[in-house]
Structure formats: C-alpha cells, structure tokens
Amino acid sequence: LKLAVFDICGTLYHDNTTYSFLRWLSKKNIIKYNKSIMNAPYILRALNVIYSSFSRKDVYRILQVKQLSDFSFDDINKWAREFVDELEENRIYSTNILMEEYKKQGYKIVIASATIEPVARAIAQKLGVEYYSSTIGFLNNKCTGEINKDLLFLKKDTLLHLLKKAETTIVVTDNYTDIELVLVSDHSHIIVRNDRDIEKWNRCLKANARKVDFIKKDA
C-alpha cells in the first residue's frame, strides 16, 4: 500500500472550511449571524489557539458548531454540497495538482481533516477520495450541535490501521497539529505562507526536516 494523506483547510483549500461553511449559511439566512461567535476579536481567537494546544479542545469551533442544532441530517449535507460547489475558486491549485500526481502513481489518497463531516464528505465526493473527519451528533435525524469526535489531535490514531499497512506514506498539510503524522511519514509536503513558517517547522522537525519540502501558499 502506498498512502498519501492530505489535510483540507489551508492545504487543499485556502479556507477554514467549517468556519466558511457557517458563514455561508449565515449569508443564506439559514443561521443567524452571531458576531461574537463568527467574528471574535483576534485576541480571543489567539487565546483559543493556545488553550486548545493544551486542552485539545477548540472552544471557538465548539461554539460555532452549536449553530447547527436542530437542522436535519439531509439538509446539512445538502447545504454542505452546495457550499463546496461554490468553494471551487478557493482551491489551492498546487496541492490539488499534487494529489492528481499521487493518484497517477498508484497511491491510495485519503483526506484527514478536523473539519466537520458534512463538509469533508462533500469535498471527498468531489475529489473521488476517502475521508476522515470530525463528526457531529445527530439524534432522531436532528443535529445536536455537538462535536462527537474531534479529529484535530487524533489524525495519527485514526489513520493507524492504514499507516501500519503502508509501505510508503506521504503527508501533505499546513497544520502544526499534524506534526505526529509528519514524523511517521516517509516524506511530507508542508504548505507555508512565508519564510517564518518554514523556520517554525524546521524548529519543530529538527533532524526530521530533511524529509520534508515546503510549498508556498500562493496558488
């Protein structure tokens, strides 16, 4: 098995797709625009990033997803497909081309993302690949607004059954929380914005930096 694992947010698409999906729903007047949740001040979002790195809970995203409460499974998934169709112009073309190259080389392609499942499923269907994502709760076909399983810090554990079988593993990501996946890969393509990101990754990777290459997030 030759395995290539792709992140979604900031890797295949410029967007944080959960957040963008909820903003899309608010623009369609499906959910109410809640400024304190959808457009929190930078300082609060920065504190949330720090808190989540220790607690492994993204409070900001938990609050965002609660806005899906009481919508039906079918409606949420239909809206997710419509949203992804409109997201086409926000693809990062260099990584999408890279995915096609690995497909041609016979790699099994999976996307692994902390984005919510309806969005990940719609993207996976569009790309023709398997997916692993965060799951949200449903009871009697209605969304509970809860994140049942958050993949943010669990990608390696979730993919372990594939990693054990893989003769070669490629990882493509921009996400520092994917460091465990990067470390067990044979080679990784890291998506970065600038030289500062490269320096940060090199500090994290240390001797493992030799098995990665960096792709600037410009297209």
Predicted regions located by residue number:
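Residue-level signal for pocket-adjacent positions within structured domains
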Residues: 7-8, 63, 131, 142
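C-terminal cap/substrate-recognition subdomain and adjoining C-terminal extension
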Residues: 1-2, 78, 85-219
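Short, well-ordered alpha-helices that flank and scaffold nucleotide-derived cofactor binding pockets
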Residues: 23, 27, 125
